[in-house]
Amino acid sequence: MFTIYTYLAPIVAMVLVVLNYLISNNNSYIEKDGPFECGFTSYQQTRSAFSVAFILVAILFLPFDLEMSSILPYVVSAYSNGTYGLSILVIFLLSLVIAFVYEINLGALNLERRYTPIVKPLMNKLYL
């Protein structure tokens, strides 16, 4: 039975792809190849730099998300792990808390910072 499905599934998929190609309408014109941005055509550069705070939050999300997936096996088998498993979990969580407190003390999570270019004082000196 499995071999029938193994041979039948690719055949059905190919038949559906060929039918889609034969039956579908293909209206290709220049507007389909152009950029679409919120319903209007952009006439200037619309790319702006990402906020550093956004990237910082995204990067800091990864270790704490991995922390949750690392805790899950302990939660599932908490009764069979005993004291040894609990001590390993506490050491793991303690190391993450220490790292988080260190980041706070460094000011890495201060999202109110604004980027000030280094060139600005130089430009003031050149124009004055």
Swiss-Prot record:
It comes from the Eukaryota. Pfam families: Oxidored_q4. Its main location: mitochondrion. One of its GO terms (cellular component) is mitochondrial membrane. Keywords: Electron transport, Membrane, Mitochondrion, NAD, Respiratory chain, Translocase, Transmembrane, Transmembrane helix, Transport, Ubiquinone. The chain crosses the membrane at residues 3-23, 52-72, 84-104. The keyword Membrane applies. One of its GO terms (molecular function) is NADH dehydrogenase (ubiquinone) activity. Its EC number is 7.1.1.2. It is found in: Mitochondrion membrane. It is a multi-pass membrane protein. It is an enzyme of class 7 (translocase). Gene3D superfamilies: NADH:ubiquinone/plastoquinone oxidoreductase, chain 3. Belongs to the complex I subunit 3 family. Core subunit of the mitochondrial membrane respiratory chain NADH dehydrogenase (Complex I) that is believed to belong to the minimal assembly required for catalysis. Complex I functions in the transfer of electrons from NADH to the respiratory chain. The immediate electron acceptor for the enzyme is believed to be ubiquinone. This is NADH-ubiquinone oxidoreductase chain 3. The gene is ND3.
